[in-house]
Amino acid sequence: MSTLDIAEDNKIKNEEFKIWKKSIPSLYQHISSLKPIFGSGVDESPSTLRSIVFTNDSSCNKSKGVLSVPLLYSQGSEIFEVDCIVPLGLHYKKPESISEPLVQPDYTMESQKVEQTVLIPKWEFKGETIAKMIYVDNSEINVKVIALSTNGSLAWFREGVKSPVYTMMEPSTSLSSASSGNQNKPCVDFAISNDSKTLTVTKEKHLDNENATIKLIDNSGKIGEVLRTIPVPGIKNIQEIKFLNNQIFATCSDDGIIRFWGNEIGKKPLWILNDSLDGKTTCFAASPFVDTLFMTGTSGGALKVWDIRAVIALGDADAELNINQGHNKVNELFKVHHFYSEQVSKIEFSSISPMEVVTIGGLGNVYHWNFEPVFAIYNEIHEDFQGIISDELEAESMAFYHTEGCRREIGENNKVNTVAYHKYIEDLVATVDSDGLLTVYKPFTGKVLDGSREVGAAKS
């Protein structure tokens, strides 16, 4: 696609955004956008890599009827803190849990303060480009956030100290030579164990004689020390890594295989999930509520729900043998789909509701799911359930669809870390677009009581 074609496509999407902006806000419990103002010297070009993550902090102003929810926003090597102003009471799960009447929100003064504030970097990972952040607020090591750069280096940041207090550095590698073939899509990821004592970091293969690797990093005693390095031969990169608990973590690589690893067990996976149907597997997530529930997403837009016990039973004997055999002989519990076969790039379970999940498409669109209707059917007809659900049930499970008037599709940057899902405020989501526009919203799902069942869904 030529530069002129891209410009024309973006122009059309901007016009669609203007139409959406006028008509759609009624489908949200709350939605607001902010274009931050930065001090001099900040690189604001659309090609600059951006990522966002919510903190766990919040502060309320009862007289104004508003809640301030901080968001960390990385742009290039710098991290900024942005106050997101939302209505007081948005953090309540149900209206009946509100103990006293709430003041009608007055955004004027509070929003203007935020909009007119010139942001200066709170932290800086000098000489690096930040790809992802994890908010930890770990009092034991006195660290607020850990940042991963595009070449696999790590930085630990402390409140009130602009430079990292700890680092784990990797040799500099030109993004243009990355095996992913796209300078805007560095294939690095990291994760933290449930007890916060261990980090895992991936590094992609750059030369023919190299392997993609996983490093286990100390996050409690000798912070930043490499505990183990695991080479993963036969692949170019690992696009996602997550802990299932303190001892087991899993990876998803460019060959579409999910590998499960033990913290202290050898250099081969314990089990694998090799699912080649519905496109290549691109991402995964494990439920924080049900330890047997596991989800994967594919390049063809399928979101699959698995019983991890079946995966373990199949892959327990010889993981490497199963890789060579191709598709695993295990079936998912059920599957649903993104619109227009949009690739599933990220899956995130709610930490509040066991049935709710947010998924991110390859174009940046955000899907909100509530699988309560599916599991209700599954429990009723468990013996006869074959993993195939009706179109009506799938539509009911998709609670909300956020496109920002197709604005989320503008730009070529990796969209995986441009969406943040709040840990404690149900359904609160933030997005950052390629031009730096921040949007914070909580969807109105359109559900109304109909006897004992809730029906309806909203799309935007």
From Swiss-Prot:
Keywords: Chromatin regulator, Cytoplasm, Meiosis, Nucleus, Repeat, Repressor, Transcription, Transcription regulation, WD repeat. InterPro entries: WD40/YVTN_repeat-like_dom_sf, WD40_repeat_dom_sf, WD40_rpt, WD_repeat_RBAP46/RBAP48/MSI1. It is found in: Cytoplasm; Nucleus. One of its GO terms (cellular component) is cytoplasm. GO terms for molecular function: histone binding; transcription corepressor activity. Induction: By glucose. It comes from the Eukaryota. Its main location: cytoplasm. A motif (NEE-box) lies at residues 14-22. SUPFAM superfamilies: WD40 repeat-like (SSF50978). GO terms for biological process: cellular response to heat; chromatin remodeling; meiotic cell cycle; negative regulation of transcription by RNA polymerase I; negative regulation of transcription by RNA polymerase II; nucleosome assembly; positive regulation of transcription by RNA polymerase II; regulation of DNA-templated transcription. WD repeats lie at residues 233-271, 276-316, 339-379, 411-451. Component of the RPD3C(L) complex composed of at least ASH1, CTI6, DEP1, PHO23, RPD3, RXT2, RXT3, SAP30, SDS3, SIN3, UME1 and UME6. Component of the RPD3C(S) complex composed of at least EAF3, RCO1, RPD3, SIN3, and UME1. Interacts with RPD3. Present with 3040 molecules/cell in log phase SD medium. The NEE-box motif is required for the association to RPD3. PANTHER family: WD40 REPEAT FAMILY (PTHR22850). Catalytic component of the RPD3 histone deacetylase complexes RPD3C(L) and RPD3C(S) responsible for the deacetylation of lysine residues on the N-terminal part of the core histones (H2A, H2B, H3 and H4). Histone deacetylation gives a tag for epigenetic repression and plays an important role in transcriptional regulation, cell cycle progression and developmental events. This is Transcriptional regulatory protein UME1. It comes from Saccharomyces cerevisiae (strain ATCC 204508 / S288c). The gene is UME1.
